[in-house]
Amino acid sequence: MSTCPFNDVFNSTDSSMINTFLKNVQVLLEAASYIESAERKDGKCEHGYASTFPSIQHSSYQRQRKFRNKKCNNNHYRSTHNELEKNRRAHLRLCLERLKTLIPLGPECSRHTTLGLLNKAKAHIKKLEEADRKSRYQLESLEREQRHLRRRLDLLRDGGGSLEAERIRTDSMGSTPCSERSDRSDSDQEEMEVDVESTEFSHGELDSVSTASTSDLDDHSSLQSTASDEGYSSCSIKLAFSS
């Protein structure tokens, strides 16, 4: 499309130039009408420039539409919030009922508030933690004692053979002196019997023995009388004399 200044077109007497200008104006008008129809159809500008000012009817319709959409969104949000709140309260009641079955509440369990129930649960948890700590300490003590007893048992098993050998050796050493003492006593008894059998008395010795026996009898009678005076028993004196 050729271009030319407006003054030249208006002042020119050339018909070809005027026809060209008119054709260009017609093309521009067709393009403007096409764009306007497209804007009315789609509601937006395809060329990127500012669109024409919408009509009053169209703007009121848009406002009503936005208001309805906003109202629907608010109603949906409110219903969703109410549903979530209802589910939360139901879950909280369920948790509180389970908590009542887990902790000791006493006879007036129906009068407990949510805060009081949570405080009692907290105190009960502390008691359980303390009991668990004591149980772990006792378990560790028992494990240490068990290890100590196992070590002692292993030592006794390892030293059982040596202890048995030591006991047998001690028994054998204890039996040897006893046998020696019994053999010695038997030999001494045999020697005494031999000495008694080999002893021979002469006539003088027999007289001295008889005299000694007579004097012993006199002494015995005197001792018996003395013992009777002193309160001693004659049987005990006889036993002492015979010994």
Curated annotation (Swiss-Prot):
The record's listing under SUPFAM superfamilies reads: HLH, helix-loop-helix DNA-binding domain
One Pfam family this sequence matches? HLH
PANTHER family hit by this protein? MAX DIMERIZATION, MAD, MAX-INTERACTING PROTEIN 1
Which key words are in the record? DNA-binding, Nucleus, Repressor, Transcription, Transcription regulation
What name does the UniProt record give this protein? Max-interacting protein 1
For this record, an example GO cellular component is: nucleus
**InterPro entries on file:** bHLH_dom, HLH_DNA-bd_sf
**Positions of the UniProt region annotated as Disordered:** 164-235
Q: Which organism is it from?
A: Danio rerio (Zebrafish)
User: What does the record note on quaternary structure?
Assistant: Efficient DNA binding requires dimerization with another bHLH protein. Binds DNA as a heterodimer with MAX.
Ranges of Polar residues composition bias in the record: 222-235
Query: Chief subcellular site?
Result: nucleus
Subcellular location(s) per record: Nucleus
In Gene Ontology terms, what is one molecular function of this protein? Answer: protein dimerization activity
What PROSITE patterns does this protein's entry cite? BHLH
Stretches of Acidic residues bias are at 188-198
Q: Which GO terms describe its biological process?
A: regulation of transcription by RNA polymerase II
Domain annotation bHLH: ranges: 76-128
Summary of the function given for this chain in its UniProt record: Transcriptional repressor. MXI1 binds with MAX to form a sequence-specific DNA-binding protein complex which recognizes the core sequence 5'-CAC[GA]TG-3'. MXI1 thus antagonizes MYC transcriptional activity by competing for MAX.
